[in-house]
């Protein structure tokens, strides 16, 4: 199991806001090892973990993380970005959607935002808390956010003590450039 640098930064953001998490409905997409979702569950949130329905190994990694962290009751569902599936339709409204480094391949960006848009219609006040590793100055979400009627706030890493090369005595996030984003519906769409 590998923990990506962005997962540690998102977990730090969750830890900084841990007092607001109990009872919140939280979905982690592209969860993998599920560090942010596991932490949210440990802080009292009602968490659902998800990864690609096309990659059963990834779903098994989510389940293993739950077992290793004494959270066998957490629901793990297969979701494929951009596809409306029965599992996606069955999800209850969420308060927060977690996404650690899901904006990895530009060809997936719109499918991710389409899935988020669908979930936002279940609860227009839901927020996407996402960490993003800058891999190319040419990649941007701005046009797609506008297209999907969403807005984005960049959260300074120093505002939640994540502006270091190591967090929680780990070597992560290292020297990677990571951004913390909070994405929601644009104001005029509410």
From Swiss-Prot:
UniProt catalytic activity: L-arginyl-[protein] + 2 S-adenosyl-L-methionine = N(omega),N(omega)-dimethyl-L-arginyl-[protein] + 2 S-adenosyl-L-homocysteine + 2 H(+)
Keywords annotated in UniProt: Chromatin regulator, Cytoplasm, Developmental protein, Disease variant, Intellectual disability, Methyltransferase, Nucleus, S-adenosyl-L-methionine, Transferase
Family, per entry: Belongs to the methyltransferase superfamily. METTL23 family.
Consequence recorded when altering residue 150 to T: In MRT44; uncertain significance
Database matches in SUPFAM superfamilies: S-adenosyl-L-methionine-dependent methyltransferases
EC supergroup of this enzyme: transferase
Biological role stated in the UniProt entry: Histone methyltransferase that dimethylates histone H3 at 'Arg-17', forming asymmetric dimethylarginine (H3R17me2a), leading to activate transcription via chromatin remodeling. Maternal factor involved in epigenetic chromatin reprogramming of the paternal genome in the zygote: mediates H3R17me2a, promoting histone H3.3 incorporation in the male pronucleus, leading to TET3 recruitment and subsequent DNA demethylation.
Localisation: Nucleus; Cytoplasm
Domain of life: Eukaryota
EC number: 2.1.1.319
Ranges in a coiled coil: none
Name of this chain's protein: Histone-arginine methyltransferase METTL23
Entries under InterPro entries matching the protein: Methyltransf_16 (IPR019410), SAM-dependent_MTases_sf (IPR029063)
Tagged with keyword Cell cycle: no
Organism annotation: Homo sapiens
Oligomer status and interactors: Interacts with HSPA5, HSP90B1, TUBULIN, UGGT1 and UGGT2. Interacts with TET3. Interacts with STPG4.
Gene Ontology biological process terms, A to Z: cognition; epigenetic programing of male pronucleus; epigenetic programming in the zygotic pronuclei; epigenetic regulation of gene expression; methylation; positive regulation of transcription by RNA polymerase II
Disease connection: Intellectual developmental disorder, autosomal recessive 44: A disorder characterized by significantly below average general intellectual functioning associated with impairments in adaptive behavior and manifested during the developmental period. MRT44 manifestations include mild to severe cognitive impairment, delayed psychomotor development, seizures in some patients, and dysmorphic features.
GO molecular function, one term: DNA-binding transcription factor binding
Example of a GO cellular component annotation carried by this entry: male pronucleus
């Amino acid at each position: 199991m590998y923990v990506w640098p962005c997962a540690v930064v998102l977990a730090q953001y969750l830890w900084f806001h841990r007092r607001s998490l109990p009872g919140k409905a939280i979905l982690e997409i592209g969860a993998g090892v599920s560090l942010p979702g596991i932490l949210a569950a440990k802080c009292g949130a009602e968490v659902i973990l998800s990864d690609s329905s096309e990659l059963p190994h990834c779903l098994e990694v989510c389940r293993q993380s739950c077992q290793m962290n004494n959270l066998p009751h957490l629901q793990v569902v297969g979701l494929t970005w951009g596809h409306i599936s029965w599992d996606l339709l069955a999800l209850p409204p969420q308060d927060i959607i977690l996404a650690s480094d899901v904006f990895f391949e530009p060809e997936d960006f719109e499918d991710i935002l389409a899935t988020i848009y669908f979930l936002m219609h279940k609860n227009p006040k839901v927020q996407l808390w996402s960490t993003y590793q800058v891999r190319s100055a040419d990649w941007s979400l701005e046009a797609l956010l506008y297209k999907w009627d969403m807005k984005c706030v960049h959260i300074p890493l120093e505002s939640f003590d994540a502006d270091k090369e190591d967090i929680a005595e780990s070597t992560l996030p290292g020297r990677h450039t990571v951004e913390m984003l909070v994405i929601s519906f644009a104001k005029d769409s509410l």
